[in-house]
Amino acid sequence: MKKKMRLKVLLASTATALLLLSGCQSNQTDQTVATYSGGKVTESSFYKELKQSPTTKTMLANMLIYRALNHAYGKSVSTKTVNDAYDSYKQQYGENFDAFLSQNGFSRSSFKESLRTNFLSEVALKKLKKVSESQLKAAWKTYQPKVTVQHILTSDEDTAKQVISDLAAGKDFAMLAKTDSIDTATKDNGGKISFELNNKTLDATFKDAAYKLKNGDYTQTPVKVTDGYEVIKMINHPAKGTFTSSKKALTASVYAKWSRDSSIMQRVISQVLKNQHVTIKDKDLADALDSYKKLATTN
């Protein structure tokens, strides 16, 4: 089961060049960037042209957001946390990892920076927005505890049906996962994954089928998902428990839901920018953060 990409692209390289060139404007000499038979391109002319690019303001905004988040909460996100997430994607995509980066507009370093931005944003969310008792009670109504399953993802329905027949004949699920699953991220550990009902990286049909199973049971018919067909076996389906004992899990589920809400996260980022006193000095780029400033005034 492949994770769905949910990352905000940080195009910082051009923004970095923009700021570096901006700094050069304070120098008395206008350095030459390039020459041609009819003349030359100076830093000032290049900087002026660069500012006309429709994506420049977006890139500058992304760069400032990252720096503001990192200054405010950088100590809360370790290098190990980022590297572990990076390695998880690298393992998931295997030999296709570089293609994955290219398709999403990343270099290896910018991908790590994007991952770090996501973690920093989550820290900011928890620092700036607290979960109320009424919100916990609302979450409790639909709450389901984390479950652990084994799964086998196949590219076609016939293979999934054969897996189910093999299980009925007594074959081991973990061995079948290794030989028949096309999910390279889980096939070698028996197809085992743990998740909660609010997990948005998994197909709804997958979660619905899994939560109907009791411990030890497996799906009797293939489950259609985006990437193919699934056979699912329930390993651990705990009881829901009580509201009081589940508060920690409920809080985590509310934050997970909020982190996927773009309007909430925009408000959080706008507050971070306000708290960090972010100001753009160049009048041609001054409105790059206007959408966040407007949100900050209504928070």
UniProtKB/Swiss-Prot annotation:
Catalytic activity: [protein]-peptidylproline (omega=180) = [protein]-peptidylproline (omega=0)
Cited SUPFAM superfamilies: FKBP-like (SSF54534), Triger factor/SurA peptide-binding domain-like (SSF109998)
Transferase among keywords: no
Keywords: Cell membrane, Isomerase, Lipoprotein, Membrane, Palmitate, Plasmid, Rotamase, Signal
Species of the source: Lactococcus lactis subsp. cremoris (strain SK11)
Gene3D superfamilies, sorted: 3.10.50.40
UniProt name for this protein: Foldase protein PrsA
Lipid-attached positions, S-diacylglycerol cysteine: C24
Gene name in the database record: prsA
